[in-house]
Structure formats: C-alpha cells, structure tokens
Amino acid sequence: MRGPALLLALRALCALSALRGTARAVNNSGRWWGIINVASSTNLLTDSGSVQLVLEPGLQLLSRKQRRLIRQNPGILHSVSAGLQSAVRECQWQFRNRRWNCPTSQGPNIFGKIVNRGCRETAFIFAITSAGVTHSVARSCSEGSIESCTCDYRRRGPGGPDWHWGGCSDNIDFGRLFGREFVDSSEKGRDLRFLMNLHNNEAGRMTVFSEMRQECKCHGMSGSCTVRTCWMRLPTFRAVGDVLKDRFDGASRVIYGNKGSNRASRVELHHLEPENPAHKPPSPHDLVYFEKSPNFCTYSGKMGTAGTAGRACNSSSPGLDGCELLCCGRGFRTRTQRVTERCNCTFHWCCHVSCLNCTNTQVLHECL
C-alpha cells in the first residue's frame, strides 16, 4: 500500500510542478506588456558623451534580448509603448459591447489571468498587441523618431504609365522585423500554447502588412494630375482592429500536430492542426485557439473574469449589447440621472463661442 501511495503522491507533485511551470511561462510571455506605463518619450540618456539606457522600472519586465533591441534602436521604446497603448484602446473599443470587454489592470500582466487560457480572447490579445508594436514602429520610422530606421525608400522609379514611386513610404518591413524579434522573443517552449501565441503574433503583424494602401499626390498644370507621385501608407489602427475582430469571430480551434522525429527539420515537426479534421488548416492570417472561452457572466478570481454585474446594457437591442445577453439572463435595473451639457453654441466674430447649459435626463440600464 505504501509503494502505490508514494507513487501517486510523486505523480501528483510532478503534475503540480508542471502546472506551476506552465503558469510561469504564460505570465512571462506577456511580461513586456507592463511597459505600457513607461512615460518617457525616449530610451536614451546622454552622460559624459556616452549613451546609456534609462533604467525605467518597466524595463525590468523585459527579457535580455528585448532590452538589447531597445538599446540598439534609440527612440524605439516610446514607439513600443505607444503601440501597446493603441492596442489596449482598440481591444476595448472592439469588445465594448461584449461580456468580455478587454478589461485591464495595473501591474505587469495588464490583461489579467485570461491570458493563462488558450481561448479566443487570448488569441485576440496577442494579435492586437503584436500588431500595435508593428504599426507604431513602422510609423515612427517614417516620422524620424527612431534613429535606426527611416522611410522605406526602396520603391523608386516608374510604377505605371502615369505615376511613379516617391515620397515617404511607411517602413512596414522594419516594423514587422522588429516586432517579430521583440514580441516573439518572450515566448519559450514548444508546446501548444507556444505555437498558438507565435501564430497569433504573426497574424497581427500580417494584418498590418496586408492592409497597407497606396496613396498618391497629383502633379500638373492647374491640378490636371498628368503625373502622380505615390507611396505606401499604413492603415488606420481602427482598420487593423476591425479585421482582427472579424478573425476573432472566425478563429480556428486547433490541436498540437507532430509530423515525426526527423531532427533535420525539427522546426517543421511541431505545427497546428484543426481540431475538426474536416476543416482546413488555419492560414497565417487566421487567429487560433485551443480552449473554450468561459462565459464571462460572473466574477471568478481563478479564471480572471470580472463578470457583467453593473455593466450598462441596451434594453431594446437583441444583440450582444442587449440586456438579455449581456446580463446572462439575470435581469437588469433601470435608473435615471440628470446630465448637464453645453448646447446651442454660437460662434461670434471674432473669435468667441458662447453656449448654454442644457440639463437632460438619461435612462440607464445596468445588469444585476
């Protein structure tokens, strides 16, 4: 009896250790998100003629490779932080009417425990934050904010019968390369979660790339536009968020695939396969997940869900923002509040605007 009991205890201990190790690995994969609170606009400090890295508290959350990348690209820290801030705002906008509305908190793991799960929401978080870094860095290059990159000047010469390449194209290639080196370096291991995170990181970057658009400026007598100068411009980040939100809704559930044990092609051995064999394998643009999402209806410290109690809902909507769905069938309360706003504004020449104060009564519905 003692032998089997000891064996079971050892197995349980090993399982617990593995779970703890997984939790640490998951938390580390998103530690760099903590730099969102880095306030400085530069990562450089000149001291006695030498350039040194500012020891911001948030930088302690970065890996050695990430700190090296920041050091090698003066000015890029602000771009990374700005890109992450854009990603958070976009995430909260896209999910503002959902049970999970992309809540954030102070601290290194700004998205909370939901990133410990392999669900759709985690997939979107990784994709949108990766896209945010790529988008912000590419734009900063063309703005001259980063010392190690400039506009993309590779497109030069004739582009068509009535236009040619010129101007300052946003440097999407530098943005993608830096984003891959910086963001992906926080992922460790070869398990399903590792593959999922890397796939969604790349999907975010590819979305920024695929949404690039050509812009042109006309030249000619009296605006005749006989010749046009064109360049490549980044999409708005709202456009990136819209595309990723559509891919969130159509995300592919995957399992861990293994092609064999050929050491010569070890990188290709581990891959993602659709859970349903009848489905097509996910494309590089698709978001992937491997775990069903919680219902997000109630608070759970273990799951990292805040619940929907107290959330504002639309009593007349049959959609996801409606009280029936958002409140998970628990019902809702109705209250009124008086709001004073500026109204009936008039412009007086020159240059003054006068307004009245109007008080309105608003009807609010909140989930129980």
UniProtKB/Swiss-Prot annotation:
Changing S222T: Decreases palmitoleoylation by PORCN. No effect on the activation of the canonical Wnt signaling pathway. GO terms for cellular component: extracellular region. It is found in: Secreted, Extracellular space, Extracellular matrix; Secreted. GO terms for molecular function: signaling receptor binding. Changing S222C: Loss of palmitoleoylation by PORCN. Its main location: secreted. Residues 1-25 form the signal peptide. CDD domains: Wnt_Wnt1. Disulfide bonds join C91-C102, C141-C149, C151-C168, C216-C230, C218-C225, C297-C328, C313-C323, C327-C367, C343-C358, C345-C355, C350-C351. N-glycosylated. N-glycosylation favors subsequent palmitoleoylation. Palmitoleoylation is required for efficient binding to frizzled receptors. Palmitoleoylation is necessary for proper trafficking to cell surface. Depalmitoleoylated by NOTUM, leading to inhibit Wnt signaling pathway. Keywords: Developmental protein, Disulfide bond, Extracellular matrix, Lipoprotein, Secreted, Signal, Wnt signaling pathway. A lipid is attached at S222 (O-palmitoleoyl serine). InterPro entries: Wnt, Wnt1, Wnt_C, Wnt_CS. GO terms for biological process: apoptotic process; BMP signaling pathway; determination of dorsal identity; dorsal/ventral pattern formation; positive regulation of protein-containing complex assembly; Wnt signaling pathway. Belongs to the Wnt family. Ligand for members of the frizzled family of seven transmembrane receptors. Acts in the canonical Wnt signaling pathway by promoting beta-catenin-dependent transcriptional activation. Developmental protein that promotes cell proliferation in the developing spinal cord. Has a role in osteoblast function, bone development and bone homeostasis. Forms a soluble 1:1 complex with AFM; this prevents oligomerization and is required for prolonged biological activity. The complex with AFM may represent the physiological form in body fluids. Interacts with PORCN. This is Protein Wnt-1. The gene is WNT1.
